[in-house]
């Protein structure tokens, strides 16, 4: 044991360096363990990358999909702005276009309107998904029309708007899909 005697105000103090040595040894050991762990993780990652592991192939595919979806965001922003301007032109002098109506798309009815704030097509939503599409049994189907009217009366508080809102909530905007009621509405009027 390495001791040093210090005299302070006529008091002799013995300072033991042994505890300081143990602390230094612990720091050296923990540093060595840390670098060994980092080296092991690096070697494992190198092995994964050079062994053509399917996990990294999936991650690469996921990154490509994520970048593609980010590219869609700018396209959807542009299309949403164009459709909003188009909606403003359609709404000029037509206050009834802001009220829900059953629009006939041939094979189905959708209860829809233009949104008063964004001037984008808006439809009554089915749960947390897309719009209610009331399929018709025949070319003229009064029961489908009646159910569409029921939706307007009782379900009009749950709506989905084409464009950015739909892209954020459902993963698609509705404009670049065919057939879809958002793109079909743009072609109808």
From Swiss-Prot:
<dbReference type="InterPro" id="IPR005023">
    <property type="entry name" value="Pox_LP_H2"/>
</dbReference>
<dbReference type="GO" id="GO:0044167">
    <property type="term" value="C:host cell endoplasmic reticulum membrane"/>
</dbReference>
<keyword id="KW-1162">Viral penetration into host cytoplasm</keyword>
<feature type="topological domain" description="Intravirion">
    <location>
        <begin position="1"/>
        <end position="28"/>
    </location>
</feature>
<keyword id="KW-1043">Host membrane</keyword>
<dbReference type="GO" id="GO:0019064">
    <property type="term" value="P:fusion of virus membrane with host plasma membrane"/>
</dbReference>
<keyword id="KW-0812">Transmembrane</keyword>
<keyword id="KW-0735">Signal-anchor</keyword>
<keyword id="KW-1160">Virus entry into host cell</keyword>
<feature type="topological domain" description="Virion surface">
    <location>
        <begin position="50"/>
        <end position="189"/>
    </location>
</feature>
<protein>
    <recommendedName>
        <fullName>Protein OPG107</fullName>
    </recommendedName>
</protein>
<keyword id="KW-0261">Viral envelope protein</keyword>
<dbReference type="GO" id="GO:0046718">
    <property type="term" value="P:symbiont entry into host cell"/>
</dbReference>
<keyword id="KW-1133">Transmembrane helix</keyword>
<dbReference type="GO" id="GO:0019031">
    <property type="term" value="C:viral envelope"/>
</dbReference>
<keyword id="KW-0426">Late protein</keyword>
<dbReference type="GO" id="GO:0016020">
    <property type="term" value="C:membrane"/>
</dbReference>
<dbReference type="GO" id="GO:0055036">
    <property type="term" value="C:virion membrane"/>
</dbReference>
<keyword id="KW-1015">Disulfide bond</keyword>
<keyword id="KW-0472">Membrane</keyword>
<dbReference type="Pfam" id="PF03356">
    <property type="entry name" value="Pox_LP_H2"/>
</dbReference>
<keyword id="KW-1038">Host endoplasmic reticulum</keyword>
<keyword id="KW-1168">Fusion of virus membrane with host membrane</keyword>
<comment type="subunit">
    <text>Part of a stable entry-fusion complex (EFC) which is at least composed of proteins OPG143, OPG147, OPG155, OPG86, OPG94, OPG107, OPG104, and OPG099. Formation of the viral membrane is necessary for the assembly of the complex.</text>
</comment>
<comment type="similarity">
    <text>Belongs to the orthopoxvirus OPG107 family.</text>
</comment>
<comment type="function">
    <text>Envelope protein part of the entry-fusion complex responsible for the virus membrane fusion with host cell membrane during virus entry. Also plays a role in cell-cell fusion (syncytium formation).</text>
</comment>
<keyword id="KW-1169">Fusion of virus membrane with host cell membrane</keyword>
<feature type="transmembrane region" description="Helical; Signal-anchor for type III membrane protein">
    <location>
        <begin position="29"/>
        <end position="49"/>
    </location>
</feature>
<keyword id="KW-0946">Virion</keyword>
């Amino acid at each position: 044991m390495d001791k040093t005697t210090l005299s302070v105000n006529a008091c002799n103090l013995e300072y033991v360096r042994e505890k300081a040595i143990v602390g230094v040894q612990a720091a050296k050991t923990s540093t060595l363990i840390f670098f060994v762990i980092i080296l092991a993780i690096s070697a494992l990652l190198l092995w994964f990358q050079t062994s053509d592991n399917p996990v990294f192939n999936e991650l690469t595919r996921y990154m490509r999909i994520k970048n593609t979806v980010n590219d869609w965001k700018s396209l959807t922003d542009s299309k949403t702005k164009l459709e909003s301007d188009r909606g403003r032109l359609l709404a000029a002098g037509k206050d009834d276009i802001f009220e829900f109506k059953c629009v006939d798309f041939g094979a189905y009815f959708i209860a829809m309107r233009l949104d008063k704030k964004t001037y984008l097509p808006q439809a009554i939503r089915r749960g947390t998904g897309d719009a209610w599409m009331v399929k018709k049994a025949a070319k003229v189907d009064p029961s489908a029309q009646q159910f569409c009217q029921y939706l307007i009366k009782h379900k009009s508080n749950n709506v989905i708007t084409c464009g950015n809102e739909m892209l954020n909530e459902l993963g698609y905007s509705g404009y670049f899909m065919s057939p879809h009621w958002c793109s079909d509405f743009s072609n109808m009027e």
